UniProtKB/Swiss-Prot annotation:
It comes from Streptococcus pyogenes serotype M49 (strain NZ131). Its EC number is 4.2.1.53. The keyword Aminoacyl-tRNA synthetase does not apply. Catalyzes the hydration of oleate at its cis-9-double bond to yield 10-hydroxyoctadecanoate, probably in the (R) configuration, and of linoleate at its cis-9- and cis-12-double bond to yield 10-hydroxy-12-octadecenoate and 10,13-dihydroxyoctadecanoate. Is not active on trans-double bonds and esterified fatty acids as substrate; is only active on cis-9- and/or cis-12-double bond of C16 and C18 fatty acids without any trans-configurations, producing 10-hydroxy and 10,13-dihydroxy derivatives. Appears to play a role in oleic acid detoxification and bacterial virulence. Keywords: Detoxification, FAD, Fatty acid metabolism, Flavoprotein, Lipid metabolism, Lyase. It catalyses: (R)-10-hydroxyoctadecanoate = (9Z)-octadecenoate + H2O; (9Z)-octadecenoate + H2O = 10-hydroxyoctadecanoate; (9Z)-hexadecenoate + H2O = 10-hydroxyhexadecanoate; (9Z,12Z)-octadecadienoate + H2O = (12Z)-10-hydroxyoctadecenoate. NCBIfam families: PRK13977.1. It is an enzyme of class 4 (lyase). Pathway: Lipid metabolism; fatty acid metabolism. Belongs to the oleate hydratase family. Its cofactor is FAD. This is Oleate hydratase. Disruption phenotype: In strain lacking this gene, consumption of the free fatty acids from the medium is reduced to about 50% of that of the wild-type. The mutant strain also appears to be 2-fold more sensitive to oleic acid than wild-type, whereas no changes in sensitivity to linoleic acid is observed. The mutant shows increased survival in blood with reduced adherence and internalization to human keratinocytes.
């Protein structure tokens, strides 16, 4: 397995690997990583579909990529997915997945054309004081603190270790709009990993100019399940892949001799009945270890989503594997000590009455029902005790929605603070109470909130997710298992709790697909290179552009930097009529 850039290998078709007809694949989990592994086995590994088996404990595929109308509850999406043009492995896969919407097109074509016709942007990112846009929304307001971000990027991961974001940055950094944008967009909290924040800063530095208004982002036409999962399922079914639901893998016995690790037996329950599959070294096993949406509980408009700390299948499986080898990671690092303040609850509100719409449209300046971009991403309420954010994507978000309905995704970044209006913690609230808090912050008159939050006007389903921010917990090398653990012959880890050699960023669709691609190509010795992530952090043009936008579009001479006038004058003379001057001018720094 190796990496490549450019389009020479991107458009090449790898030849059939030697011995692939004697191999079989067993994939644990039908989240995006598991589905992608099956796609790459077929497309690039030339493995017959009937030799590929996927095991899913739930009755539905997709993992965290959800979107469903739950009987007796209503429409539910537990989270959203933000994409960008440099998700190299993701677009590499979806170019081969036929669109279910446009005959003869790929899903990449469908997505690309949608974004061309209706590019994403936000007209309002931050509000406060009951529905009023923050005056300096659109500015990072970092000032001198921009140098702290540069300092983070200059550090090595080894030197940061398990340091938290709060331990690295000053208090003034957290007062900036940059931190509000960053924390609420990516779900970072102060006690999360400084290493992961550094990875994010380096990975997405080319989008610094487009984060405040979300022009850097791209979204699906519908919810994640309909748009992203269904086309892959259709592709796999067309290749006769075996997908088994209500099947929970509980353990995998691994034989370790002479420095080699060979998966020998898969233990599982199928519809509650214990079964086992004996394996040979030619049987390839791909494990999705851990899950941010494992053990989710659902409330209703009148019921709370009950808090839980149940580990569930994916975490228990990882624990059983980790007990066999230190090379299989340390799951407790991620799930055991999540602070009470962490994000745990999201909610999906379905607006059924036009009385609420004006309070939204005065922020977006867009028609909710024209089928185009609405909020363009989340709108964050900066004076919300919950640090509440909400998003309204293109409507309908579900094909089953009625013509006048609008679905809204809501979440609170802080779970142990009382609301400004409801005076309860978000995890103690019913769907109606979460709606009341949201309407209060939108500026709905207090005497109308109770009525407009009633089920006659809106239906809101809260979800409690005990491990939703576990990706970002402080960690050190070895806490996440390598995609191919040292000495492994036939066992791979895939998904966002596996350690990709690429140092890409977790909590992204790209990372799920990348780890799957790395695992398949490693086992089958694929002769085609895996696309590198866009290394914008090593492009001086992108760095200069980011420096300009982090300082709110100021030229160097106007920045609050400790540069004496004499040195500045000498510096200008030295670079005059040089390539450096050209670069600085292109970045608007001179």
């Amino acid at each position: 397995m190796y990496y490549t850039s450019g389009n020479y290998e991107a458009f090449a078709t790898p030849r059939k690997p030697e011995g692939v007809d004697q191999k079989s694949a067993y994939i644990v989990g039908t989240g995006l990583a598991g589905l992608a592994a099956a796609v790459f086995l077929i497309r690039d590994g030339h493995m017959a579909g009937e030799r590929i088996h996927l095991f899913e404990e739930l009755p539905l595929a997709g993992g965290s990529l959800d979107g469903i109308e739950k009987p007796h509850l209503g429409f539910v999406t537990r989270g959203g997915r933000e994409m960008e043009n440099h998700f190299e492995c993701m677009w590499d896969m979806y170019r081969s997945i036929p669109s279910l919407e446009i005959p003869g097109a790929s899903y990449l074509d469908e997505f690309y054309w949608l974004d061309k016709d209706d590019p994403n942007s936000s007209n309002c990112r931050l509000i406060h004081k009951r529905g009023n846009r923050v005056d300096d929304d659109g500015q990072y307001t970092l000032g001198k603190q921009s140098k702290e971000l540069i300092h983070l990027i200059m550090k090595t991961e080894e030197s940061l270790g398990d340091q938290t974001i709060e331990e690295f940055f000053s208090e003034d950094f957290f007062k900036s709009n940059f931190w509000v944008y960053w924390a609420t967009m990516f779900a970072f909290e102060k006690w999360h990993s400084a290493v992961e924040m550094r990875r994010y800063a380096m990975r997405f530095i080319h989008h610094i100019d487009g984060l405040p208004d979300f022009t850097s982002l791209k979204f699906n036409k519908y919810n994640q399940y309909d748009s992203m999962v269904k086309p892959i399922i259709a592709y796999l079914e067309s290749h006769d892949v075996d997908i088994q639901f209500d099947t929970k893998v509980t353990d995998i016995q691994v034989e370790q001799t002479a420095g080699k690790k060979v998966a020998k037996t898969i233990h599982m329950t199928v519809s509650g009945e214990a079964k086992a599959i004996e394996l040979t070294p030619d049987d390839l096993v791909f494990v999705t270890n851990g899950s941010i949406t494992e053990s989710s509980t659902y409330g209703s408009h009148h019921e709370v989503a009950k808090p839980t700390k149940a580990l569930g299948g994916s975490w228990n499986l990882w624990e059983n594997l980790a007990a066999q080898s230190d090379d299989f990671g340390h799951p407790k690092v991620f799930y055991q000590d999540l602070p009470a303040e962490s994000w745990f609850v999201s909610a999906t509100a379905t607006i059924k009455h036009p009385a609420i719409e004006p309070y939204i449209e005065r922020l977006t300046h867009r028609d909710l029902h024209d089928g185009k971009v609405n909020t363009g991403g989340i709108i964050t309420i900066t004076d919300s005790n919950w640090m509440m954010s909400f998003a309204i994507h293109r409507q309908p978000h579900f094909k089953e929605q009625k013509e006048n309905e609008t679905t809204v995704w809501i979440y609170g970044l802080y779970s142990n603070s009382e609301g400004n209006y409801v005076h309860k913690k978000i995890e103690e609230c019913t769907g109606q109470e979460i709606t009341e808090e949201w309407l209060y912050h939108l500026g709905v008159p207090v005497d109308k909130i109770k009525d407009l939050a009633s089920q006659e006007y809106i239906n809101t389903v809260p979800v409690y997710m005990p491990y939703i921010t576990s990706y970002f917990m402080p960690r050190v090398k070895g806490d996440r298992p390598k995609v191919i653990p040292d000495g492994s012959v036939n066992l791979a880890f895939i998904g966002n709790f596996a350690e990709s050699p690429s140092r890409d960023t977790v909590f992204t669709t790209e990372y799920s697909i990348r780890t799957a691609m790395e695992a398949v190509y490693s086992f089958l010795n694929g002769e085609r290179g895996i696309p590198q992530g866009f290394n914008s952090a090593y492009d001086i043009r992108e760095l200069l552009k980011a420096f300009y936008y982090l300082n709110d579009k100021k030229a160097i001479k106007d920045m609050d930097l400790p540069i004496p006038a004499l040195i500045e004058k000498i510096g200008h003379k030295k670079i005059k009529d040089t390539f450096i001057e050209e670069l600085l001018k292109d970045a608007n720094l001179m």
